[in-house]
Amino acid sequence: NFKDFKKTIVTYGVLRGTFDIIKKVQNYYYIDHGYFNQSGREFKNNRTGVLNFDGYFRIVHNNLIHSGDGNFPDDRLKNLNINIKKQNKSGSYIILSEPSEIMKKIYNQHNWVEETKQKLKKFTDRKIIIHNKFSNITLDELLKNAWAFVSLQSTAGFKAMAMGVPSYFTEKTLIKINNIEEIENPK
């Protein structure tokens, strides 16, 4: 029953009406799972369960996704001890990461999977595997032989990059990371 939209709010996630409030306030801090070394989660029965709070979370001001802009000491990333693998040059298929229903709604991308598949087919003839957090095959297993990972805004794209799989995003804050038109010639 929040009504004072002039106040700054802090929210964890976008469910339970919090996104409706985000749209109305002038100033907010958004908290969600981090891009790296996330807390343990499990995905089942169309729900995400947080198993522990030992990992990192992200806090973003007036957006759902951090732009990456700013100057940050490199020791912050080094302290995460992320083993970044060399780029996989022999992957055979593209993982198309289906957004959750709430993200499709928030970003007004109800046909994102089909529209993105059609766009990809203009630039590649590789097999496209649609994956979401409730898929039977784990993302870790799929990434072993993936050529690329394509997502609207999933933090799984950062995991893919760390595992040597180039990631492509269509969300405006992340689109500058890679260009889908260059999917056959990744950076």
Model-derived regions, located:
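C-terminal amphipathic helix plus adjacent low-complexity
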Residues: 8, 60-62, 84, 110, ...
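Residues at the C-termini of beta-strands that transition into short coil/loop
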Residues: 13, 32-34, 132-134, 171, ...
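Short amphipathic alpha-helical segments
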Residues: 21-23, 108-109, 161-164
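Active-site and donor-binding regions of nucleotide-sugar-utilizing enzymes
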Residues: 1-59, 99, 137-140, 156-157
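Donor nucleotide-activated moiety binding/catalytic core segment of transferases
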Residues: 2, 17, 118-121, 126-178
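Conserved catalytic-core segment of nucleotide-activated headgroup transferases in glycan assembly
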Residues: 87-134
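A nucleotide-sugar donor-handling region in carbohydrate enzymes
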Residues: 31-93, 97-106
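Structural motif
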Residues: 7-8, 93, 147-148
